[in-house]
A protein has these predicted regions:
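Charge-rich, low-complexity intrinsically disordered segments
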Residues: 279-316
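Conserved N-proximal alpha/beta basic substrate-recognition cap immediately N-terminal to
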Residues: 1-88, 107
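Short acidic-glycine loop/turn motifs at beta-strand connectors
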Residues: 116-121, 182-186, 265-268
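A long amphipathic alpha-helix within ATP-dependent nucleotide-binding catalytic cores
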Residues: 144-175, 179-263, 297-310
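A short alpha/beta connector and helix-capping loop motif
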Residues: 112-120, 274-279, 290-291
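Active-site nucleotide/adenylate-binding loops and adjacent lid/helix of ATP-dependent enzymes
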Residues: 54-161
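Glycine-rich phosphate/pyrophosphate-binding beta-alpha loops
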Residues: 196-207, 276-288
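A short beta-strand motif that forms the metal-chelation/ATP-contact edge
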Residues: 5, 262-279
């Protein structure tokens, strides 16, 4: 038995009641160092036999390595290295004009630094601390940059990732949040995609960091000329997202939704920046796509109902 929160549709209130374990569990707890997450981890370990709609997704480095194994995805993955020493960072900067240094398990744009190479010995850094406070842009010599990065990393595990040119003419960064979910037929389906524009001086586009959401097509129009070409880019992004979702589910285990953070350059090439297993839905409300928001809420329930009927049906 569990002491569950039960919704009363007549009173429109929630209350605690003792109930037997549910037939299906939809895990929406975000990965974070907290007592609640530790409780969830112990629960999943103890009751591993229960039916979960989704399994925890692994860290960013592991997901990158999994996707890299499939040749279909390689051209869509920014080159990424584990930040084991500052040599990893400078090796990337030898090949790309800018890179991002990000925590292996970070969310919400926290703890991300952008490094741009200005000359052989001079670099421009910008970032966002773990509390989401923006670090103003500053120029550092190579030796000082090394010290800064080692202090920034501390005892944590970080990645160094190829930077993609995602600045708009006004200097703000942008990307796209693509949500794919299982539908009522048990198939992966595109729920929606919204554009995100970062706050002034921010190196990330996250909404919690001061960014705002817009409709995908209007943001694409700022960099891609021609409606036909924009639709082609959108179809490519959707097809890639669906293929990645199916591949990760096949490799890792049960999943019912994924949000992919995508960068699209001026040539229309799509890059996968991150894959998020427990995404928020507010990006669709903010962008004005209320229908995508409605679908984002309903689809997991429709998939759960389909899965329940399928597992409860007597085998022939």
């Amino acid at each position: 038995m569990i002491h569950a929160l039960v919704y009363d549709p007549k009173k429109r209130t929630w209350s605690r009641k003792w109930r037997s374990f549910p037939n299906l569990i939809f895990d929406r707890c975000r990965i974070q160092r907290s007592k609640r997450f530790e409780q969830l981890r112990r629960f999943r370990s103890r009751y591993a036999h229960l039916n979960y709609l989704n399994r925890p997704l692994r860290d960013k480095w592991t997901i990158y390595q999994i996707l890299l194994k499939k040749s279909r995805f390689r051209s869509h993955l920014p080159r990424t290295l584990m930040f084991r020493s500052t040599a990893d960072v400078f090796n990337l900067l030898n090949d790309y004009p800018s890179i991002y240094v990000k925590p292996i398990n970070g969310t919400g744009g926290r703890g991300i630094t952008r490094v741009e190479k200005l000359s052989n010995d001079m670099y421009l850094i910008q970032g966002r601390k773990k509390n989401r406070r923006i670090i103003p842009a500053q120029k550092l010599h190579k030796a000082r940059l090394s010290a800064f990065l080692l202090n920034w990393r501390g005892s944590g595990r970080f990645l160094a990732q190829q930077g993609i040119q995602i600045k708009l003419p006004n200097g703000r960064v942008h990307d796209y949040r693509m949500l794919v979910q299982k539908n009522g037929q048990g198939e992966w389906d595109v729920t929606g995609c919204a554009g995100r524009i970062g706050a002034p001086r921010s190196v990330t586009s996250n909404l919690h960091g001061g960014g705002h959401a817009v409709m995908m097509n209007s943001l694409l129009a700022q960099g891609i000329t021609g409606e036909e070409r924009r639709q082609e880019v959108r179809r490519t992004a959707e097809r890639l997202s669906l293929e990645i979702a199916a591949y990760l589910e096949k490799t890792i285990g049960a999943l019912c939704e994924l949000a992919l953070d995508l960068a699209i350059d001026k040539n229309g090439h799509v890059y996968v920046l991150e894959v998020n297993p427990k995404p928020a839905r507010e990006v669709f409300i903010q962008s004005g796509d209320s229908e995508a928001y409605r679908r984002a809420i309903i689809k997991p329930l429709e998939y759960a109902l389909w899965l329940h009927k399928r597992t409860a049906a007597p085998s022939s």
